[in-house]
Amino acid sequence: MKIGIVGAMAQEVQMLADLMQDKRVTQVASCTIYEGMIHGKAVALLQSGIGKVAAAIGATLLLEMCKPDLVINTGSAGGVATGLNVGDIVISDETVYHDADVTAFGYAKGQLPACPARFQSDEKLVQLAEKIAVQQQQQVKRGLICSGDSFIQGGTPLAQIKADFPTVMAVEMEATAIAQVCHAFNVPFVVVRAISDSGDGEASMSFEEFLPLAAKQSSAMVLEMIDNL
């Protein structure tokens, strides 16, 4: 088995890259791919860059070049559900674009043509992540994660996302693009992210301050998943 892992930013993949043995590094376009062994498991680790297009380019390269059997998306997210705090873990049941709208042609909000209304995460991976979070005594929630090419800082954008997707737990900028690529390639995926901010008016300051904590928390979760796959 080969495990694929995707993070957008250097801080979100560095801990795992540092643990990798027999490491081979490939730079393609704006993406960096690390291949090697982590705790005796074959891993392909991608730093994709930020945003949906970068994530889709990177995920496609990862799946074509490295042929992983599954993909875990790691990193940080803005927590918008009640009860989520900085450092808590969110696990995707499903993902959707909050900035896609083809409803004029009868599609659901967030749905693109030829795609499902929402991209479903692999249930076995979801359950494994949830089990590990509980074992690590992490605060964890599973549910809907919404993606778009905007850093959400409260106000009208956040209100609109909540109106369109009342069950949304967290917002970020890559997960659904990765999910769409995995769906196209029929590769199981799950999103495991740690909360860095609350998507409100203080989000940018909170993100800068708490990104290292979120990256550490999500990477620790993924490392434990590697050990249990």
Swiss-Prot record:
Its EC number is 3.2.2.9. It holds the Pfam family PNP_UDP_1. The keyword Cell inner membrane does not apply. Substrate binds at G78, I152, M173, E174. It catalyses: S-adenosyl-L-homocysteine + H2O = S-(5-deoxy-D-ribos-5-yl)-L-homocysteine + adenine; S-methyl-5'-thioadenosine + H2O = 5-(methylsulfanyl)-D-ribose + adenine; 5'-deoxyadenosine + H2O = 5-deoxy-D-ribose + adenine. One of its GO terms (cellular component) is cytosol. One of its GO terms (molecular function) is adenosylhomocysteine nucleosidase activity. The keyword Amino-acid biosynthesis applies. Pathway: Amino-acid biosynthesis; L-methionine biosynthesis via salvage pathway; S-methyl-5-thio-alpha-D-ribose 1-phosphate from S-methyl-5'-thioadenosine (hydrolase route): step 1/2. Keywords: Amino-acid biosynthesis, Hydrolase, Methionine biosynthesis. InterPro entries: MTA_SAH_Nsdase (IPR010049), Nucleoside_phosphorylase_d (IPR000845), Nucleoside_phosphorylase_sf (IPR035994). Gene3D superfamilies: Nucleoside phosphorylase domain. The active site is at E12 (proton acceptor), D197 (proton donor). Catalyzes the irreversible cleavage of the glycosidic bond in both 5'-methylthioadenosine (MTA) and S-adenosylhomocysteine (SAH/AdoHcy) to adenine and the corresponding thioribose, 5'-methylthioribose and S-ribosylhomocysteine, respectively. Also cleaves 5'-deoxyadenosine, a toxic by-product of radical S-adenosylmethionine (SAM) enzymes, into 5-deoxyribose and adenine. This is 5'-methylthioadenosine/S-adenosylhomocysteine nucleosidase. It comes from Pasteurella multocida (strain Pm70).
